[in-house]
Design a protein with these regions (language model features):
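Catalytic strand-loop segment that frames the active site of acyl-thioester-processing enzymes
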Residues: 1-50, 137
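HotDog/MaoC-like acyl-thioester-processing domains
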Residues: 1-8, 85-139
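Short, intrinsically disordered/low-complexity patches at protein termini
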Residues: 33-34, 73-74, 79-81, 111-112, ...
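Sparse recognition of residues in long alpha-helices and their boundaries
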Residues: 39, 75, 105-106
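Hydrophobic beta-strand-centered segment that forms part of the acyl-chain substrate-binding groove
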Residues: 43-50, 56-99
Length: 139
């Protein structure tokens, strides 16, 4: 077994304004709240916010880096709920909990069900997540 029920893993991340803008451009997200500090200052958010594609990538990336250190890993499905913005220059905690591990003979590994979130500097959940990955010896 390469994953364990109740296993937790996390990391802290701070996205700079230039990282927020570059990721949004690369993802094809033209919303100026991710690119233009002057525009963002006039919104309800008052500053640059990371795109949903960027925050979801942080969550998916953490599963990949965590489980790939133990063997082969493939993402099967992910679900996200965006509750509040993640701001540029805000240090956030990206967290996952292994909820269930199911051996899957046909796929040749364990199907791992996860529950995750990104917590803002205030401790509140900014993004909620669920995921399912395959962890195996080989692909």
């Amino acid at each position: 077994m390469k994953a364990y029920p109740r296993e937790r893993f996390s990391t802290e991340v701070t996205l700079t304004p230039s990282e927020v803008a570059a990721f949004a451009r690369a993802a094809g997200d033209p919303n100026p709240v991710h690119h233009d500090p002057a525009f963002a200052a006039g919104t309800r958010f008052r500053r640059l916010t990371a795109s949903g594609s960027q925050t979801s990538a942080l969550l998916m990336g953490l599963t990949a880096s965590h489980f790939s250190a133990r063997g082969a890993m493939v993402g099967l499905e992910f679900w996200f709920r965006f509750r509040r913005p993640v701001f540029a220059d805000e240090t956030v905690r990206v967290e996952w909990l292994v909820v269930k591990v199911t051996p899957h003979a046909r796929l040749g590994g364990d199907v791992v069900d996860l529950r995750g979130r990104i917590r803002g500097a205030d401790g509140q959940t900014a993004v909620g997540a669920k995921g399912r990955v395959l962890v195996a010896d080989t692909l």
